[in-house]
Amino acid sequence: MSFSSLYKTFFKRNAVFVGTIFAGAFVFQTVFDTAITSWYENHNKGKLWKDVKARIAAGDGDDDDE
């Protein structure tokens, strides 16, 4: 894609340029958030509440108070 066709498509009208920026930011945010959440949950597997809650409900919790 040459520069002139890129200019005519995205940069000539400000509304299209701003819309492209917002759409790109939205897509980047969605992909970045999904990737970071997946990495975080994988890195902390077994330590998160959703993992601990299942063990407590099953009765495998080590309760020294009882």
Swiss-Prot record:
It is a single-pass membrane protein. This is Cytochrome b-c1 complex subunit 9, mitochondrial. GO terms for cellular component: mitochondrial inner membrane; mitochondrion; respiratory chain complex III. The chain crosses the membrane at residues 18-43. Residues 44-66 are mitochondrial intermembrane. Residues 2-17 are mitochondrial matrix. Gene3D superfamilies: Cytochrome b-c1 complex subunit 9. Component of the ubiquinol-cytochrome c oxidoreductase, a multisubunit transmembrane complex that is part of the mitochondrial electron transport chain which drives oxidative phosphorylation. Belongs to the UQCR10/QCR9 family. Component of the ubiquinol-cytochrome c oxidoreductase (cytochrome b-c1 complex, complex III, CIII), a multisubunit enzyme composed of 10 subunits. The complex is composed of 3 respiratory subunits cytochrome b (COB), cytochrome c1 (CYT1) and Rieske protein (RIP1), 2 core protein subunits COR1 and QCR2, and 5 low-molecular weight protein subunits QCR6, QCR7, QCR8, QCR9 and QCR10.
